[in-house]
Amino acid sequence: MKKSFLFTSESVTEGHPDKMADQISDAVLDYIIERDKKARVACETLVSNGFCVIAGELKTSVYAPMQEIARKVVQEIGYTDALYGFDYRSAAVLNGIGEQSPDINQGVDREDGEIGAGDQGLMFGYACKETPSLMPLPIWLSHRLTEGLAKKRKDGTLPFLRPDGKSQVTVRYEDGKPVSIDTIVISTQHSPETQQSHLKDAVIEEIVQKVLPQEYLNDNIRYFVNPTGKFVIGGPQGDAGLTGRKIIVDTYGGSCPHGGGAFSGKDPSKVDRSAAYAARYVAKNLVASGVCDKAIVQVAYAIGVVEPVSILVDTQGTGKVEDSKLTECVKAVFRLTPKGIIESLDLLRPIYRKTAAYGHFGRELNEFSWEKTDKVEAIKDFCGIK
């Protein structure tokens, strides 16, 4: 008898308040790192009804025009009219940025040229064979839906849509493999005059049917489109948004553990971000090499210390070689010191705004160097697999 279960993941659009905050924080990071590669950035953003607060710590010689950066992000997301609940022109932008503590900095910038970890912590990476990008199917589908909401709003196909929105996809698995979609939930902000029946039909026809792979669609899918009724008040007018509040959306949709550290607004000396990217890089290359069908990779660091304090590979029983050997392989093939990660993934680039919506992983963009599978042959050689 086949073992059957349901698994659910969610995504949010770029106009969700938490994602607005993430994008502003990463836009600040991009502005600074483009001009000062030695900068240390920890930028946190709050958006609420009619205002935005940018706070955190910097160590840089660059002046960053915070108001201009924040307003440009909000404009590009689509909050261009007060009727949407937030307007890039009239929103107040408050700057509470301070200087990085020298106590932290002394452990990061070392005299020997190495970089100490910016904090202690544990990070996870994951890969599996459920999608071509080696991501879990539920989160991959959820991101495609929220991307679809934004695309159809911006290109005018569904002009009644507004920037705020969410998706959630429940997938049925049999014997550990995805076989069909069970439930789709979409909540999207819309114009006041929009009829709910029209909105539901349009979202299913223009987004679900055109975005999701036909192999997973069936006549028995349960659809919940704006299940509470109208969704006119949205964005920061409806809910406050904060940087780092969507860490499961940002990663694997709950398919693997999470160390708890957020990404956005942090320069790559912060291992919360860079080591999580490296762990994905490791996991994806392990699965792509064929040595396993799934890989969870954990790395952990101590503040100011160069080498990781632990590295773990868990293939959940799918490995063709022992997990302990794969752990040794990772140590031999990959550079997992903060400096090694930054150099091997070329992380001192203004690439981070793009990561701040629709997932940091599983998107084949040129900027996303951690999605490369250029270590496959080295892994095969180490493991003796042809």
Swiss-Prot record:
Residues binding Mg(2+): 18
MF term (GO), any: methionine adenosyltransferase activity
Report the EC number(s), separated by commas if there are several. 2.5.1.6
Q: Which residues bind L-methionine?
A: 57, 100, 239, 270
Lineage top rank: taxon: Bacteria
Where is the segment annotated Flexible loop? 100-110
Details of cofactor binding? Binds 2 divalent ions per subunit.
Name the positions where K(+) binds.
44
InterPro entries annotated for this entry? Answer: ADOMET_SYNTHASE_CS (IPR022631), S-AdoMet_synt_C (IPR022630), S-AdoMet_synt_central (IPR022629), S-AdoMet_synt_N (IPR022628), S-AdoMet_synthetase (IPR002133), S-AdoMet_synthetase_sfam (IPR022636)
One GO term describing the cellular component: cytoplasm
Q: Which UniProt keywords apply?
A: ATP-binding, Cytoplasm, Magnesium, Metal-binding, Nucleotide-binding, One-carbon metabolism, Potassium, Transferase
Give one Pfam family.
Answer: S-AdoMet_synt_N
Report the subcellular localization.
Cytoplasm
Report the protein's function: Catalyzes the formation of S-adenosylmethionine (AdoMet) from methionine and ATP. The overall synthetic reaction is composed of two sequential steps, AdoMet formation and the subsequent tripolyphosphate hydrolysis which occurs prior to release of AdoMet from the enzyme.
Its recorded name reads S-adenosylmethionine synthase
* Annotated source species: Helicobacter hepaticus (strain ATCC 51449 / 3B1)
